[in-house]
Curated annotation (Swiss-Prot):
Its cofactor is Zn(2+). It is an enzyme of class 4 (lyase). Catalyzes the dehydration of methylthioribulose-1-phosphate (MTRu-1-P) into 2,3-diketo-5-methylthiopentyl-1-phosphate (DK-MTP-1-P). Zn(2+) binds at residues 103, 105. It catalyses: 5-(methylsulfanyl)-D-ribulose 1-phosphate = 5-methylsulfanyl-2,3-dioxopentyl phosphate + H2O. It comes from Sorangium cellulosum (strain So ce56) (Polyangium cellulosum (strain So ce56)). Its EC number is 4.2.1.109. GO terms for molecular function: aldehyde-lyase activity; methylthioribulose 1-phosphate dehydratase activity; zinc ion binding. Pathway: Amino-acid biosynthesis; L-methionine biosynthesis via salvage pathway; L-methionine from S-methyl-5-thio-alpha-D-ribose 1-phosphate: step 2/6. This is Methylthioribulose-1-phosphate dehydratase. Belongs to the aldolase class II family. MtnB subfamily. One of its GO terms (biological process) is pentose catabolic process. Binds 1 zinc ion per subunit.
């Protein structure tokens, strides 16, 4: 997979990378059916995001839409932005260092988020691949993924996520119970790296049959 880690100056280049990212995740079974959504910050502060209800392994440029910081379409489009656009907008508002966001629905993330919903978090520790996360320098550190209740009140969920991130930095991602993983990075390249690292650790935890 080829990504450039760009400054996201143009829609055309970002759309191409989001299409490639979507296909990358779909091929690994992380976005079954039409699940998942992906976005990146554009140079003017608006966001390019995948349209709602589209299979992520077969996206075209028309399946990428542009929204403003509040999640509203910036121009006429036959496509609708993802129903979870507000969750993407929350992350970009939370930190100017976030340049791309990914939401996947892998088997491991779905199962473990259900298993750990009552505890409220999934703890991943002792995995060497954790050092792929930006700022992580040792495998002995613990990666804490909060688990939020799956709700259709996306605005309220975004508020809950923002409060957790403010109270417990650094946060590398979070889970929605029975739903999947949200993670992010400074650009698409780092976001891909974070997806792979976290999904790998979740796979390992699932195979191990439990979490401490």
């Amino acid at each position: 997979m080829s990504v450039r880690g760009t400054s996201f100056a143009s829609f055309s280049s970002v759309a191409a990378e989001l299409i490639e990212l979507s296909r990358f995740c779909h091929e690994r079974g992380w976005t079954p059916a039409t699940s998942g959504n992906f976005s990146a910050r554009l140079g003017d502060g608006s966001l390019a995001i995948t349209a709602s209800g589209r299979p992520k392994g077969a996206l075209g440029v028309s399946d990428i839409v542009v929204v403003n910081a509040d999640g509203r379409l910036t121009g006429p489009s036959p496509a609708r932005p993802s129903a979870e656009t507000a969750l993407h907008c929350q992350l970009y508002r939370h930190s100017s260092e976030i340049g791309a966001v990914a939401h996947t629905h892998s088997r491991a993330a779905t199962v473990l988020s259900r298993r750990c919903a009552q505890e409220g978090y999934v703890t991943l520790s002792g995995y060497e691949v954790a050092k792929a996360l930006s700022g992580m320098t040792t495998h002995t550190a613990t990666v804490l993924l909060p688990v939020f209740v799956n709700t259709q009140d996306i605005r309220r969920l975004a508020e809950d996520v923002d409060a957790f991130m403010s109270a417990h930095p650094p946060v590398y991602g979070y889970l929605i119970a029975g739903h999947g993983l949200y993670t992010w990075g400074s650009d698409i390249a780092s976001t891909i790296r974070h997806i792979e690292a976290i999904e790998f650790m979740l796979d390992c935890a699932l195979l191990e049959g439990g979490l401490s």
